[in-house]
C-alpha cells in the first residue's frame, strides 16, 4: 500500500519548484516586454506576409520540377497552422500575392526589403530575450536571411514532395498495416514538423549559442501549445458572435487575434528556452563572481590571441563561467569595446591587456572592495594568474588596514583625522621601502 503522507511529502517540493519555475517564466515574459513585441510582430507580419508569399511563389516558378508545389504548400500551411476560419484569409492572401508578382522590379525589390525587415525584427526580439545586444552584421546576416528567403522555400517544397510520396506509399502500406501504425504516424507528423520548425527557430535565430537540448524541449512544448491553441481558438470562434457582429469583415479581427496569439506562444517558448538554459547553467554561473569570471574570460582571450584564434561561446562555457553569466558579461565587454564580434559570430580581443588593469576590470563589472578582497576557492580550470591575483589581494588588505586602522576616538575627532590622513602617505612610503 502506498503511504499517502510520504507521497505528498515527496511531491510537495517538486510542485513548489515547478511553481517557482513558471513564476520566473511569467516574470521574464513580462519584463522582456513580450506582449508588446508580439503586437509589433503582428503588425509587421501583416506587411511581410504577402511579400514572403510572393518570394516563395517566385522561387518555385524558377524550377519546373516544383510546378504546382507552391499551391500545395500554401494549402498545407493553412490547414495545419491556421484554424478553420483561415480559408477566407488564404484566398485574400493568394490574390494579393498574385498581384504582387505582377509588380515592376522596383516594387518587387520593395517587397523583398519588407520581408527582410520582418526577419531582422524577429532576430532583434529573440536577441532581446537572450540579452544579446549585438545583432548579426555584414555577410553573416545577409547569408542567413538570403537562405531563409531562397533556400527555405525549396526545402519546404522538397519536404512536401516527400510527404506526397509518403502519402502514396501509405495507400500501399495500409493494406498490410493491421494495427494502424501508418495512420498513427501521419496523424502525428504535423506535430513533429512543427516541433522541428520551432526548435530550429529557437536555436538558430538568437545571435548566441543556444543549447540544442533546451531548444528541442522548448520546440516540443511550443508545438503542443500551438496545437492546443488551434483547438481552443477554433472552438471560441465557432461559439462566438463575431460573424453576427462583423459579418464578412469578421475574418480581419479574427486573423489579427490569431497572429498575435501565435507570436505570444512563440515568444513564450523562447523565454522558456532561455529560462531552462539559465537554470541548467546556474551552478556554473554561481561558482565565479563577476570579477573572477571576467578575468577568466580575458585569460582565455589572451591565450587565443597568441595563436591568432577567435573565441567561441563554448570556450567560455567550458571554462566554467556559465552560459547565461557569460552572455551578461559579454554585453558589457562589447559595449566597452574590450571584445568584438566577428562576422562568423566568434569573438576577438580589441584591447591591449598591457593597458588594462585589474581595477579597470573591477569597474567594468561594478565589483566592490569586498569582492576584490574575497578570493574564491581555486579550481582546476584557473591559470597561473590566480596566484598573482591572490598576492595582490593580500596587498589590498594591508593597504585597507593602513587607511582604516585608526581608533574610534580618533575617528570621532575631525582634527586628529586630518593629521592621520596627512601622515598616511609617509607611513606607506616607509613601509614600501
Swiss-Prot record:
Pfam families the record matches: Virul_fac_BrkB
InterPro entries: UPF0761_bac (IPR023679), Virul_fac_BrkB (IPR017039)
Residues passing through the membrane, by range: 46-66, 103-123, 142-162, 185-205, 217-237, 247-267
GO annotation, cellular component aspect: plasma membrane
Keywords, ordered alphabetically: Cell inner membrane, Cell membrane, Membrane, Transmembrane, Transmembrane helix
NCBIfam families: yihY_not_rbn (TIGR00765)
Family label: Belongs to the UPF0761 family.
Entry protein name: UPF0761 membrane protein Sde_0901
Higher taxonomy: Bacteria, Pseudomonadati, Pseudomonadota, Gammaproteobacteria, Cellvibrionales
Amino acid at each position: 500500500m502506498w503511504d499517502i503522507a510520504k507521497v505528498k511529502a515527496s511531491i510537495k517540493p517538486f510542485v513548489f519548484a515547478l511553481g517557482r519555475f513558471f513564476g520566473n517564466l511569467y516574470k521574464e515574459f513580462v519584463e522582456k516586454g513580450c506582449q508588446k513585441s508580439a503586437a509589433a510582430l503582428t503588425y509587421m507580419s501583416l506587411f511581410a506576409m504577402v511579400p514572403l508569399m510572393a518570394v516563395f511563389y517566385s522561387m518555385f516558378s524558377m524550377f519546373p520540377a516544383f510546378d504546382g508545389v507552391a499551391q500545395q504548400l500554401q494549402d498545407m500551411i493553412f490547414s495545419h497552422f491556421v484554424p478553420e476560419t483561415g480559408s477566407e484569409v488564404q484566398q485574400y492572401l493568394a490574390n494579393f500575392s498574385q498581384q504582387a508578382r505582377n509588380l515592376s522590379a522596383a516594387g518587387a525589390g520593395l517587397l523583398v526589403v519588407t520581408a527582410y525587415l520582418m526577419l531582422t525584427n524577429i532576430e532583434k526580439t529573440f536577441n532581446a530575450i537572450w540579452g544579446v545586444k549585438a545583432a548579426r552584421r555584414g555577410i553573416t546576416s545577409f547569408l542567413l536571411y538570403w537562405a531563409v528567403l531562397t533556400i527555405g522555400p525549396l526545402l519546404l517544397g522538397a519536404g512536401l514532395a516527400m510527404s506526397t510520396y509518403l502519402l502514396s506509399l501509405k495507400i500501399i502500406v495500409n493494406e498490410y498495416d493491421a494495427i494502424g501504425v501508418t495512420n498513427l504516424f501521419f496523424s502525428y507528423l504535423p506535430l513533429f514538423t512543427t516541433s522541428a520548425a520551432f526548435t530550429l527557430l529557437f536555436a538558430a535565430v538568437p545571435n548566441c549559442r543556444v543549447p540544442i537540448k533546451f531548444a528541442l524541449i522548448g520546440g516540443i512544448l511550443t508545438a503542443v501549445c500551438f496545437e492546443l491553441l488551434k483547438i481552443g481558438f477554433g472552438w471560441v470562434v465557432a461559439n462566438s458572435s463575431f460573424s453576427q457582429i462583423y459579418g464578412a469583415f469578421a475574418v480581419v479581427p479574427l486573423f489579427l487575434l490569431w497572429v498575435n496569439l501565435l507570436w505570444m506562444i512563440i515568444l513564450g517558448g523562447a523565454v522558456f528556452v532561455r529560462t531552462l538554459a539559465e537554470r541548467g547553467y546556474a551552478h556554473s554561473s554561481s561558482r565565479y563572481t563577476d570579477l573572477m569570471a571576467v578575468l577568466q574570460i580575458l585569460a582565455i582571450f589572451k591565450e587565443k590571441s597568441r595563436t591568432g584564434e577567435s573565441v567561441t561561446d563554448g570556450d567560455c562555457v567550458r571554462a566554467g563561467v556559465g552560459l547565461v553569466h557569460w552572455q551578461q558579461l559579454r554585453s558589457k565587454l562589447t559595449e566597452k569595446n574590450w571584445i568584438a564580434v566577428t562576422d562568423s559570430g566568434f569573438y576577438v580581443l580589441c584591447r591591449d591587456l598591457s593597458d588594462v588593469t585589474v581595477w579597470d576590470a573591477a569597474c567594468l563589472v561594478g565589483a566592490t572592495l569586498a569582492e576584490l578582497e574575497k578570493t574564491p576557492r581555486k579550481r582546476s580550470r584557473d591559470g597561473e594568474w590566480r596566484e598573482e591575483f591572490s598576492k595582490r589581494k593580500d596587498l589590498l588588505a594591508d593597504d585597507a588596514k593602513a587607511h582604516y586602522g585608526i581608533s574610534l576616538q580618533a575617528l570621532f575627532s575631525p582634527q586628529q583625522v586630518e593629521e592621520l590622513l596627512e601622515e598616511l602617505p609617509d607611513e606607506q612610503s616607509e613601509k614600501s621601502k
